[in-house]
Amino acid sequence: MSHSEAMKAVAVKAKEASRKIACADGTARNAAIIELAALLEQEKEFIFAENKKDLDAAKERGLDQARLQRLEITPSVLEYMIQGCNEVAGQADPVGEIEKMERRPNGMMVGKMRIPLGVIMMIFESRPNVTVDAAVLCLKAGNSVILRGGSEAIHSNLALASLLQKALGKADLPAEAVQVVEVTDREAVGELLKLDEYIDVVIPRGGEGLIRAVVSQATMPVLKHYKGVCHMYVDSDCEIPEAMDIIKNAKTQKPAACNSLECLLVHEDIAKEILPSLGVLLGACGVTMKGCPRAMPLLGPKAIAADFDDWGMEYLDLILCVKVVSTQDEAQDHISRYGSNHSEVILTKNHDRAMRFIREVDASMVGVNASTRFNDGGQLGLGAEIGISTSKLHSYGPMGATELTSTKFVLLGNWDVRN
């Protein structure tokens, strides 16, 4: 069977299953998710053994330590997956919810009902836990899912998918609602991205190169963010000790996260007061500071001059660009030019400036006096998330189960005809 035929067979199975899973009762979908949590605990030795196959092969191929860490399923990672299943199962069912039911002047009732998107394809790198996270959210929202993880995690992904399918079967739901692409070469992905007749949306998670490749080939809508170039603007009217704590958290808590701070903009009236201390604080944390000409003398002797390419760079590392600005206008113009619509924050005691920042800055999360690290489904009250979208269509920001649904109009008439 050719790649084209094999991938079409996968998509057809997912499409057929999507009709059944969409009509299934929410109780059955929750039962499958709870059963999966139990299976993850019961079959943990099997999971660890399959994951070890991937780790051993990755070490032989010379994968770097960061990618090996993302690939490994540790006991704590597995426990997090189990907790995520139970948390999602406990959430309200988004499917079938009717919103804004209103009576029209002609007496008819009109509203909107939440419905599944259909078939969602997830393309992701390295992290096998995404197999469970993505599938559980898709199932919660009544969707079927096609999972295409990185080739380096093939044994782990297949093991986890087998448990997902087993859990679906025990809940009397179609096992075909979860499909894993077993072919590891990239040609298979290209074939799937042509199948908009069967696949309703694709969500890529990984590096910017992967995401741009998916966008360039996909014939169906893509929910994505290319990168997280997150800014923080320190206003002249600011609590300096608290601001320094927030900046440290945003940069150093998890520098490889897409919601970590990459560029700090500081008002000139407060720069001399905050930047020398900040240079010492972040320097002690191993952060390399790259500054504009006005920031360089204030950041300490280890600071490096920023060049043009540094603005707009997603480092995902202990590197921070710092720019001194004269006005809030200049700060917001910089964000507009170099930002990626991900997470942007202002630190200020001035209410009017904060509200202006919220109104005018375009990002999936705009914050006041808080770390950029809060742009996360769990922190924003969504529970687990399938990813963060910086595409305003169909969703903007972290995507939980509700964001994996759409709406249809519901019309309740009384034997009405249109005049």
UniProtKB/Swiss-Prot annotation:
Signal peptide region: none
Cited Gene3D superfamilies: Aldehyde Dehydrogenase, Chain A, domain 1, Aldehyde Dehydrogenase, Chain A, domain 2
Keywords linked to the UniProt accession: Amino-acid biosynthesis, Cytoplasm, NADP, Oxidoreductase, Proline biosynthesis
Chief site of localization: cytoplasm
EC code: 1.2.1.41
Top-level EC class: oxidoreductase
Subcellular location: Cytoplasm
Metabolic or biological pathway: Amino-acid biosynthesis; L-proline biosynthesis; L-glutamate 5-semialdehyde from L-glutamate: step 2/2
GO process annotations (BP): L-proline biosynthetic process
Taxonomic superkingdom: Bacteria
Molecular function terms, GO-annotated: glutamate-5-semialdehyde dehydrogenase activity; NADP binding
Gene Ontology cellular component terms for the protein in this record: cytoplasm
Catalytic activity: L-glutamate 5-semialdehyde + phosphate + NADP(+) = L-glutamyl 5-phosphate + NADPH + H(+)
InterPro entries in alphabetical order: Ald_DH/histidinol_DH (IPR016161), Ald_DH_C (IPR016163), Ald_DH_N (IPR016162), Aldehyde_DH_dom (IPR015590), Glu-5-SA_DH (IPR012134), GPR_dom (IPR000965)
Function: Catalyzes the NADPH-dependent reduction of L-glutamate 5-phosphate into L-glutamate 5-semialdehyde and phosphate. The product spontaneously undergoes cyclization to form 1-pyrroline-5-carboxylate.
Similarity comment: Belongs to the gamma-glutamyl phosphate reductase family.
PANTHER family: DELTA-1-PYRROLINE-5-CARBOXYLATE SYNTHASE, GLUTAMATE SEMIALDEHYDE DEHYDROGENASE
Name used for this protein in its record: Gamma-glutamyl phosphate reductase
Annotated gene: proA
